Structure formats: C-alpha cells, structure tokens
C-alpha cells in the first residue's frame, strides 16, 4: 500500500480492512501509554508536589478532550458517510465545518482558562503555594494553547474516517518521540521544572499539527478546503448534534472518575497506588478495543453512506468477534495470572494482595468493556451517538452509589466491584440495543 493511499473499506475482505485500519490506531495508543508512564517518571523526579500540580491541571485537559469530542466524533461520522456516498462536496463542507467549530471552541476554552486560571485551581483547595503556582502555570500553558491539540484531534478523526490511520500514527508518534526528548531537556537541563513539562507538551503538539498540514497538502481529501470561508451553520449544527451526546458523556465520565478517586483515596495510599498501577495494566485491554472501535466506526460510516447495509452487519460481527476474543483473553489473564502480572510493577509484598484483588475483580468485566467500546464505534459510525451516551452516562453514574454502598461492606474491593459490575451491565445493554436497532433500521 502506498503511503498516502487510503484503506478501501467498501470492498474486499472485511477482517483485513478492519485490521489494517485498527493496527496503527492501537500502536498509537500503546505509544501514548508508554509516553505517559515516562512523562510521569520525569515529573516524579521533581517531587510529589510537582506530580500533584500536574495532576490537578490535567483534569482540565480531560475536560477539553470531552469538548473537542463534539466536532471530532460528529465530523468523523459525517465525513465517513459522505465519502461512502461519494459526495465530495459534502465531504468538503463537513471537513471545513469541523475545523472551524473546533478552532472556535479551542479559542473560547483557552481564553476562559487563561482568565480564570487562579479561580479554577482554587476549586481543588490546595494548601501549598508552590503547588498552586505550578498548577496555574501548567494549566494556562497547556490549555491556553489547546488549539493545536483540538486541530490534531480533528485531523485524526477525519483521516481515520477516510482510511488514513497510518498518517495519524506517523504524526502522533513524531510528537510523542519529540516530547520524550524535550521533557528532560526543558525540565532539568533548562531548569524550567513544571513549566518545562508544559512547554514540551505544547511544542510537540505544534509539530504534530505541522506534520498533519504537510500530509494534508498531498491528500486529495483536503485540496479544496478553505478554513477562512464563511461558516456553514447547517453543516456545523449537524456535526455538533451528533457530537454533543458523546462530548457530555466524556466530560461526565471525567467528573465521575474524579469522585471515585476521592472515594479510593479515603482507603489510604496503598489503594490509590493499586488503582493507578491496575488501571495501567487494564489499559492494554481497552486500548486495543478502542483501536478496533475507531476502525469499526470508519467502516460503518462509509458503508452506511454507500447504503451497503449488509456489509455494515458483517463488519460489526467481524469486529465484535475480534474484540470479543481479545476481551475474553484479557479477562482470563487478569483472573488467572494476577500475581505475576502485578508483581512486575510493584514489588512490596504488603501491596501485592490488594493488587491481585483489583485485577481479579476487574478481570470479570474486560470482555463486556471491550464489546461495549466496539459497539459504541458502530453506533457512532451510523451517526446515532445517543444510545451509547445514554447507556454510559446512566450506568457510569451508578458507580457512585454502588461504590459507596459496596465499600461499606467490602472495603475498597467494593469500589472495584462497582466499576466491574457497571461495565458488565453497560456492555450487555449496549450490544443488545445495537442488535435490536440494526435489525429494525439496517435492512439490506
């Protein structure tokens, strides 16, 4: 396959198409995970105060990711559908609308962060003045220049929808490698500490944007795009209508996770450490599922736009088979080999039993979490983002009362069971919903 040739999602073997599209996406996720671990390692050398300041500021990055999901997910579905229908004019209109709306969101969000940075950090009731100042500096730099991150997300969504996931892998990997190099240089050599970490992130994001722009010049997909043209309210509204539910879902998930983290911290530092390490181990499961979900999304949107409904059904079944087998494998590994796995990350014998409990309990839900993620991709590809958002918001919110009640009887394990049970329910409900929906609406 030539470098800038897209993967044909409308014809040929389905498994091959899905895999070729998913592999670069999954590789990007795993590189991102490795970067996050190394990044936290460098910041950790500055002390717990620096880690706390970056952690607090990071919450607003998560909220920003939820915001950019609105134009990203909406445009990914509609660009994919218009490509499948071979409607070049609509494809162009949706791409322009996606970039224009995301840039507007980024400017508004960045201005709010810069103006209210002090007030926003005060929400976390930090006591140490150094930590507060570091948090404010990290916040206004990373979120004040969030426009590059937003533009990169839109490029990623559109290129994936068009079958160009290899391009996104190259661009993102370039940024991650650069970030790995810049972190120690700016943090320690230039002695910029937390500010250095923030600058490394922004510089890397700018480079990623430049790589995307370089690629865009060579792709027919972007040849007639005019970002300075008058915004088309009709196309923007269609994008935002589809992207709004998952955007709210993402931001609420962040808020719920923050509350759950507070519950976990009430059981002491060991529980916090177990959750941090355990979630990194568990991410191997959902990252692979996320990669195939993005692949299923693009495959579904293009074939839905081309009215290849039978191929949509077959694509979903193929994707679910792959993701289901992966989820089953990770469930078995976490349930039957928790000790050897967790001991690779934490060696203290007093912590290991808690880590084993975490992996076993979460192991029961891996299969269901994977099929939920994959099914969300299929729904999003159809432009029907409301069902997965409803299921996620309702049952993720249920984690809070479940965690409070179960932890009263089971200790911190009750929180793990609340997370696992809710994932099992979400996977079961969403898959059932999609099967019923596709039988009624997707008739070949």
Describe each PLM feature range.
Residues 51-111, 149-168, 261, 274-338, ...:
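Small-residue-rich hydrophobic transmembrane alpha-helices
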